[in-house]
Amino acid sequence: LRGGRAVRSSENRLPRTTADRLALVALSGLEEFRPVYDGLAGMEVFNPSPEAMRRPQAPTPGDPLRRDGSNIASVLERLRHSSPETERRVEEYLRAIVPGTRSVRSSAMSGWETLEFQQDVSGSAGPWSFPASAVSDGTLRALGVLVALFAGTGEALSPVGVEEPEIALHPAAAGVLLDAIRDASEHRQVLLTTHSPDLLDSSTILPGELFAVRSVGGTTEVGHPDAAVRFAFDESLFTAGELLRADQFQPEPEEAVSR
């Protein structure tokens, strides 16, 4: 499609499309395009807010996680009953990202739900319990990102987007966070936005997994990294994080899409 008109198609007959409407909606009536439409329509995008996660909430079914993570206590309660393995995976990564954390669970309080963390305390024989109000932004943000990555909606694992997952996290936790993202991507498509060189400081990241984003003249251009960046990757000259620090990420001019 270009300008709302079909240039080339695998189908003999197509519904009418216009330049000011998303063509995929019209095409979703065709069996061949329906899975694409369902997958994109089911995409979830999250930006967990520690402030929202601290507030006690009325209990909900916990399906799905809200964009700001405000109902995360209900989601954890759902996972405890319906998917204990997912709950364990979330806690394992949380322990690796936030040393000293033992577990997290939903806690009822006068008809409301909140989070309760079990954490090691120096000199104590066992872990202490802390409410969400006493836990750092970084811990809450890490929990929100992990639940967004692994929880899913019902039986589905739709594509998931997370905005700047590194916010409020210690730079040393970036490697574990990347491991969690890789793990989640084995089961669902994961899309991230990031400004963090620390998160991208890994030789396992390939140029085909990255999109460069630039603001040019009031428009946003998005595309795969340009030839200079790809050469640096191919020759193992720099990691993605090092290139980002040097402000060398540019979208390929021929394929950049403006918004």
Regions found by a protein language model. Name each.
Residues 44, 113-115, 209:
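Short beta-strand micro-motifs in enzyme catalytic cores
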Residues 99-102, 165, 186:
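Proline-centered flexible-loop/turn and helix-kink motifs
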Residues 1-10, 115-121, 217-226:
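Short, well-ordered strand-loop elements centered on a beta-strand within folded domains, enriched
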Residues 114, 119-125, 129-162, 171-176, ...:
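GG-anchored amphipathic helix commonly corresponding to the ABC/SMC/Rad50 NBD signature/C-loop
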Residues 164-170, 199:
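ABC ATPase nucleotide-binding domain "signature" loop
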Residues 1-96, 102-105:
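Electropositive, glycine-dotted interaction segments
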Residues 102-115:
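Long, charged, glycine-rich C-terminal linkers/tails
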Residues 176-259:
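C-terminal lobe/lid and adjacent interdomain/linker elements of RecA-like ASCE P-loop ATPase modules
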